[in-house]
């Protein structure tokens, strides 16, 4: 996460109002709850859009991040009451990225999702950036402490599954629960201005993949969603 803050605090109230008004009619995650819907086709970035510096390409069937900090988001609409399946690896052991969820409106720049959505962090060694375990892989960035440390070394494939169940967010990493959070749970004080604003997030929001910097190369092999069983 780059260490700067450019979003006005006054905008937060507007986004929270949007979050409160969200309902199931906005949810585009529909279909068979027993079948994953692949939203990355393995060939190109159809259905995705990039905002902010840097970008993403598809190489050998994988999304590859370039430069940053920016965000590649899925344009189909908001999702909630669903599961998100992501398979990724890092080029090196300590590369940085994240899976963004609960983004209240369609992004037009890179910082709104940071402050008003949630980032499920990808960073195996936050201590190398003078950050603590609240900033490690599988955490809601700066908000949750790991229930377990289940990441594989950076160049190995990792499987992340994120459950959005109302306001509750559960993160499974390689089959191990590492995060279980719902609105209202206690969170630590903000230490840096680049950390997200505190407060509720929408039950239904956009999702995206972060490209962090020139030195942080992450590859995504699968991105899929399916609705929760009712």
Task: Describe each model-derived feature in a short phrase.
Residues 1-4:
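Positively charged n-region of N-terminal signal peptides that target proteins for export
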Residues 7-8, 106:
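General helical structural elements
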Residues 20-230:
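Carbohydrate-interacting regions of secretory-pathway proteins
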Residues 8-17:
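Bacterial N-terminal signal peptides
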């Amino acid at each position: 996460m780059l260490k700067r803050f450019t979003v006005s605090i006054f905008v937060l109230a507007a986004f929270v109002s949007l979050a409160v008004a969200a309902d199931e009619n906005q949810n585009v995650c529909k279909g068979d709850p027993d079948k994953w819907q692949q939203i990355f086709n393995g060939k190109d970035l159809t259905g995705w859009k990039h905002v902010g510096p840097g970008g993403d390409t598809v190489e050998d069937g994988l999304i590859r991040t370039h430069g940053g900090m920016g965000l590649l988001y899925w344009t189909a609409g908001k999702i909630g009451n669903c599961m998100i399946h992501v398979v990724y690896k890092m080029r090196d052991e300590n590369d940085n990225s994240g899976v963004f969820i609960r983004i209240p409106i369609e992004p037009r720049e890179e910082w709104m999702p940071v402050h008003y959505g949630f980032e499920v962090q990808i960073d195996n060694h936050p201590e190398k950036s003078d950050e603590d375990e609240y900033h490690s892989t599988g955490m809601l960035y700066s908000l949750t402490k790991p229930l377990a440390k289940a990441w594989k070394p950076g160049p190995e494939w990792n499987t992340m599954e994120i459950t959005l169940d109302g306001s509750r967010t559960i993160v499974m990493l390689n089959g191990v629960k590492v995060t279980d959070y719902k609105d209202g749970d206690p969170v630590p004080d903000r230490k840096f201005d680049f950390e997200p604003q505190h407060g509720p997030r929408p039950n239904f929001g956009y999702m995206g993949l972060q490209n962090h910097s020139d030195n942080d190369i992450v590859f995504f092999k699968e991105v899929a969603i399916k609705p929760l069983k009712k």
